[in-house]
Amino acid sequence: MSIGSFVRFDRRYGLVIFALGIWIWIGYSIYAHTSKKIIKATIIQSSKPVRHIDDRIYPQKKETLWFDTLYFPKGNELRHPKYGYLGYRQNFVAFFDTDIDVPKDEFVNFVIYSDDGFRLTIDKQKIMEYPKDRPFQKSEKVVRLAKGKHHIHIKYFQGYGQLGIVGYYAVGMSAKEAQKARKYLIGKSSSDLKFLEH
């Protein structure tokens, strides 16, 4: 084998390794940014102002997306850290739906930070709400859930200005224990509560 053929072989080998590296990187990027179907989000843009959780919506655009967590931090546009900016800034509602499996009867503390308002229901029963405009603030409620499967539905609205909604939960054998327990993002399973993938 001459030096020239060795150099050609080396370049080809290098190109194959480079192409393989790019292929692996693209595959990982797609996998890392593919949403687990944990939380179904239906977002409706209204052509008229929204100032209250029960205001009539005049649909201008409707979109259904899937997310792994209820984490849309405070900002000027609806954004998820994993999936980026979603193009919603004002006058919209979002419906978040997910199912959970509770392994035993337990108390669950739900903590919702929102700007503007929201309503949380479990199995069609209203648990807590803040129905009007507000800056990014916290609402908290402890509920007792029986062993088994439950459906969580969160309605969120944004009027104008800053926006965001972030949800956490914590589990305990008593209400007081649930308030002090470690908090997890809604959508992230723990040993005490499992979010079901669709």
In which residue ranges do the predicted regions lie?
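Extracellular/secretory pathway-exposed regions associated with glycan biology
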Residues: 3-103, 113-198
